From Swiss-Prot:
Residues 1-65 form a coiled coil. It comes from the Eukaryota. It is found in: Cytoplasm. Gene3D superfamilies: Immunoglobulins (2.60.40.10). It comes from Danio rerio (Zebrafish). This is Cytokine receptor-like factor 3.
Length: 444
């Protein structure tokens, strides 16, 4: 094959490969369009159903309220009518009885006048006596029309106007949720979730973060508050989890629509304390350690992590949930190894902070000092690689200098310094040492 033919063949192969890549990219974009269309149509369908359900429930509730109010007013009418008519009925019975008595008296009087002369005197005497007993000049009092109820209903259009105004402002349709998840960052045994507001007209008062496993249908609350990030812990590594966030506007009680769920996971094993160390009791997840009084009084020991799970670029946090008596040897920190021949992290190949706030680098105390550690204190360690000076370029781990820039934060203060190690390390241990019982520390 000639050189020209080989060149053409090579060009053809490159064109085929480019076409395959182009087709693959287009297919991915078609899939993206399909997902976008599915989201639009799916969310539109769900929104229609939500609107119809809400307004149907509202209509039913308002109708029930109106019917209840109508029945209440009708009952008031019935009560007033009954209370007002009852004395009128009694008066009517009294008058009708008087009319009946007067009719009977008239008949007797007319009969007495028409009787014979011999009976006239007796009949007229009896009639006159009976007429005097009846008291023909005594009449019952009949109330005037102004003294009896004349019922009416006071109705105006203010409720209708107010209802119309409220209905006109009730509900809204948004093309996007007011908040969205901005970033998912894996952390040991968890995922750091960051979110942000995307609606400039929305003023959030609180945020609400939920998560679930990808194979579960039930979300659970992870955080409610004003922060825009939260570390969700106790997640199994290499397991997908879905995260979503919503917000509550200022002065509102209802939550906004949920953000579009984002999938995240962690590949990093959770930070755990080493079990079985004398003088320390661990929680079931091994992320909380409590200094007990099982060891000899006044003699502490260092509790290390179960394995070197801290990597540069991460933030390691110690949170003090209970405190005991302090000792100058107490410490929290990070180290290159897990030596057991020492009772404190204030040693070589370690950086730490003591409970009085003193900072130690390779066993030497720095001049800078942080606030003392008490209940509720959170101490953070951040590290980044500054420089690497290996002796053997073919094997960097074989001797040389390894420099890390360390930032220790406590309270509202922090110290920054360079930590020189004599070997390159991919990961580091963390540890704590307390001389007296009562201390409890959570690591994450």
């Amino acid at each position: 094959m000639s050189i020209e033919a080989e060149a053409l063949l090579q060009e053809a192969k490159e064109s085929i490969e480019a076409a395959q890549n182009y087709r693959s990219e287009l297919q991915q974009r078609l899939h993206g369009l399909s997902q976008a269309r599915k989201q639009v149509r799916g969310s539109a369908s769900q929104t229609r159903k939500a609107l119809q359900r809400h307004f149907q429930e509202l209509q039913t509730a308002v109708s029930r309220l109106l019917i209840d109010r109508l029945n209440g007013l009708l009952q008031e009418v019935d009560n007033i009518e009954l209370d007002s008519v009852s004395p009128l009925d009694d008066c009517q019975k009294l008058i009708e009885h008087g009319v009946s008595t007067a009719d009977e008296l008239l008949r007797e009087g007319e009969a007495a006048i028409r009787c014979s002369i011999n009976e006239t005197e007796d009949k007229l005497g009896s009639f006159t006596k009976k007429a005097l007993q009846i008291q023909l000049d005594s009449l019952p009092e009949v109330p005037s029309l102004v003294d009896v109820p004349c019922l009416s209903a006071q109705l105006d259009d203010s409720l209708l106007h107010m209802f119309r105004a409220h209905v006109a402002r009730h509900g809204s349709v948004a093309s996007h949720p007011p908040v969205q998840i901005e970033e998912l960052v894996e952390r040991p045994g968890g995922v750091l979730v960051r979110w942000c507001k995307v609606d400039d007209d929305f003023s959030p008062q609180d945020y609400r973060l939920q998560f679930r496993r990808s194979n579960s249908s039930q979300y659970e609350d992870a955080y409610i508050g004003k922060d825009t990030e939260f570390l969700v812990l106790h997640l199994d590594p290499h397991v997908d989890h879905l995260f979503r966030v919503c917000a509550r506007g200022e002065g509102r009680t209802e939550w906004s629509p949920w953000s579009i769920p984002q999938t995240g996971y962690t590949t990093l094993a959770p930070h755990e304390w080493c079990p079985g160390v004398d003088g320390y009791i661990l929680s079931s997840r091994k992320n909380i350690a409590m200094r007990s009084d099982s060891s000899a009084p006044g003699h502490g020991g260092v509790l290390y992590s179960n394995s070197p799970t801290y990597f540069c670029g991460q933030t390691l946090t110690f949170k003090i949930t209970a405190a005991g008596q302090t000792d100058k040897r107490d410490s929290l920190g990070v180290c290159a190894d897990s030596r057991t021949d020492t009772d404190s992290l204030q040693r070589d190949q370690a950086v730490c902070i003591s409970t009085n706030g003193a900072v130690f680098v390779n066993g030497k105390e720095m001049t800078n000092q942080l606030p003392a550690i008490t209940v509720g204190s959170s101490v953070t360690f951040d590290m980044e690689v500054v420089s690497l000076f290996p002796v053997n370029n073919n094997n960097p781990s074989d001797g040389g200098n390894f420099k890390l820039r360390v930032t220790i934060g406590s309270g509202n203060r922090e110290v920054v310094f360079d930590w020189l190690l004599d070997q390159v390390l991919d990961s580091l241990f963390f540890g704590c040492s307390f001389t007296h019982p009562g201390w409890k520390v959570l690591v994450f």
